[in-house]
Every structure is written in C-alpha cells, then in structure tokens.
Amino acid sequence: MQKSKMFFEDFEVGLVIKTGSKKITKKEIISFAKNYDPQDFHIDENKAKKGPFGTLVSSGFMTLGISFTQFFETGVVKETSMGAWGIDELRWTYPVYPDNELKSEVKV
C-alpha cells in the first residue's frame, strides 16, 4: 500500500509508484539541451534531420530529470528525502520526441 509519506523501511520489494504525466515541448527540449546537452539532434531541427533519429529528440538527462520530478511530486518522499545516493544502472531505450507525453512507474 502506498502512503503519502514514506521512510526507507516502508518501501517493500514489488511496490510500484505511478506518476502523473507531462507533455514534452520542442521549446523545453531545445532550452534544456542548449544549457546541458548541446548536441545537434537536441538543439537544431535542421541538423537533427541528418542525425541518428532523423528529427529533434530530448536529452536523456532531461527525461531523467523529468522522471525524478514526477516521482518527487507524488509526495511519497517529499518530507522524508535524505538526498539521492546514486543510480546503479540507467538506460535510455527509446528516444523522446517533441509532444510526447511522459509518465513514470517507480518499482522497488
């Protein structure tokens, strides 16, 4: 059972926390990438057409940040967070395009 305020010992293996969704805009993709991941396929529509995805795509680091924000906004650890210790394994298996909608499922 998901509580609104959870401590480390409250997280049980198999627990799934679902988040709300967020639509990713072209403007957000370009703005984030210009500051933090300035690869052509994130910041320039014309150059992106010649890139590996054939169009503009979001930075994986942007999608990671959005996923974390979505989890935090569930309120589960808002009052109990002690910071993040790190990520052992992370893979971006699909590109995120402008106007895609992202939602997250966090599984313990």
Task: Give the positions of each predicted feature.
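Hot-dog-fold acyl-thioester-processing enzymes
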Residues: 1-86
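Hydrophobic beta-sheet segments that form the core/acyl-binding groove
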Residues: 83, 88-108
